[in-house]
């Protein structure tokens, strides 16, 4: 894939091909790491059911903590990529923005992972610790040929707007500079400003799905706009696993990301 021409590590390239579509060179990732931060939310109480639904819908990968492998591994049908999340923090912690490392790259390899991910809250009071973790783990990923996804979110006392194009661009660039192969960050809400974020980041950017939207059309239009602005995929959790038709919304997202269909056409995939 052309966007990974700068990566010479064969192991990384092989694994990246498992979580990116070779034709569109984009990805649809369904994060299910919310159980650690927010508890057993609707939609992920039984992770195996959700994993099977998004796999049937055409998602490229699921993302979660090591427990996802034990309790949500796909038992039949088409395979789906596995991304192990290495960071943890909870909404009931004294500092919900602080993320700590709870597993290793080596453990992710033993679990059969195709990539690992880290969460960094740029602007948090403990952000320097998360920067250190990202930089050091990127070296370990290089040694083992493991792709690294950095979730770079502007969050903290000085962050007034988490979608501010300047802070989103800074967060994305920071992740790439510290060694991430793929950046997951906020969509700015506007294609023109997001284009500038993409231009300023040497690593491909996958947009976060964000909080649950009011309508499917609103959500899918955001995905469409982000792809046209240079995004290389979407990583959406709640807008997928809390949907009444998990398989259908996944198919709709894939139609837009991989086939560039119009939103009205993609909406036809949703049956409920």
Swiss-Prot record:
Q: Which is a GO BP term held by this UniProt record?
A: aromatic amino acid family biosynthetic process
Top EC group: transferase
A GO molecular function for this record?
hydro-lyase activity
Positions of 1-deoxy-D-threo-hexo-2,5-diulose 6-phosphate binding: 33-37, 153-155, 209-210, 237-238
The active-site annotation reads 33 (proton acceptor), 153 (proton donor), 184 (schiff-base intermediate with substrate)
As its record notes, the protein acts as a catalyst of:
1-deoxy-D-threo-hexo-2,5-diulose 6-phosphate + L-aspartate 4-semialdehyde = 2,3-dioxopropyl phosphate + 2-amino-2,3,7-trideoxy-D-lyxo-hept-6-ulosonate
Protein keywords: Amino-acid biosynthesis, Aromatic amino acid biosynthesis, Schiff base, Transferase
Does Protease count among this protein's keywords?
no
Q: Which domain of life is it from?
A: Archaea
Q: Which Gene3D superfamilies match?
A: Aldolase class I (3.20.20.70)
Q: What is its EC number?
A: 2.2.1.10
Q: What does this protein do?
A: Catalyzes a transaldol reaction between 6-deoxy-5-ketofructose 1-phosphate (DKFP) and L-aspartate semialdehyde (ASA) with an elimination of hydroxypyruvaldehyde phosphate to yield 2-amino-3,7-dideoxy-D-threo-hept-6-ulosonate (ADH). Plays a key role in an alternative pathway of the biosynthesis of 3-dehydroquinate (DHQ), which is involved in the canonical pathway for the biosynthesis of aromatic amino acids.
Q: How does it assemble?
A: Homodecamer.
PANTHER family, per database record: 3-HYDROXY-5-PHOSPHONOOXYPENTANE-2,4-DIONE THIOLASE (PTHR47916:SF1), FRUCTOSE-BISPHOSPHATE ALDOLASE CLASS 1 (PTHR47916)
Belongs to which family?
Belongs to the DeoC/FbaB aldolase family. ADHS subfamily.
Protein name, please?
2-amino-3,7-dideoxy-D-threo-hept-6-ulosonate synthase
Q: Kindly list the organism's lineage.
A: Archaea, Methanobacteriati, Methanobacteriota, Methanomada group, Methanococci
Q: Which gene encodes it?
A: aroA'
């Amino acid at each position: 894939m052309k966007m990974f021409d700068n990566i010479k590590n064969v192991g990384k390239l092989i694994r990246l091909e498992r979580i990116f579509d070779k034709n569109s060179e984009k990805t649809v990732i369904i994060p299910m790491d919310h159980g650690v931060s927010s508890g057993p939310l609707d939609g992920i109480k039984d992770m195996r059911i959700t994993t099977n639904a998004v796999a049937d819908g055409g998602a490229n990968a699921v993302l979660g903590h090591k427990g996802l492998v034990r309790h949500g591994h796909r038992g039949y049908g088409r395979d789906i990529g596995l991304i192990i999340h290495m960071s943890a923090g909870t909404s009931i912690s004294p500092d919900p923005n602080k993320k700590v490392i709870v597993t290793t790259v080596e453990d992710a390899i033993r679990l059969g992972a195709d990539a690992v991910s880290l969460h960094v809250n740029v602007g948090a009071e403990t952000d320097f610790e998360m920067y250190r973790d990202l930089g050091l783990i990127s070296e370990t990923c290089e040694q083992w040929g493991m792709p690294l996804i950095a979730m770079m979110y502007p969050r903290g006392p000085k962050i007034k707007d988490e979608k501010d194009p300047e802070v989103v661009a800074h967060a994305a660039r920071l992740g790439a500079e510290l060694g991430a192969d793929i950046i997951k960050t906020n969509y700015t809400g506007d294609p023109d400003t997001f284009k500038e974020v993409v231009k300023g980041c040497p690593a491909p950017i996958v947009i976060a799905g964000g909080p649950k939207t009011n309508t499917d059309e609103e959500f899918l239009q955001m995905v469409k706009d982000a792809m046209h602005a240079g995004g290389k995929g979407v990583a959406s959790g709640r807008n997928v696993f809390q949907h009444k038709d998990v398989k259908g919304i996944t198919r709709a997202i894939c139609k837009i990301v991989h086939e560039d269909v119009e939103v009205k056409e993609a909406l036809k995939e949703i049956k409920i």
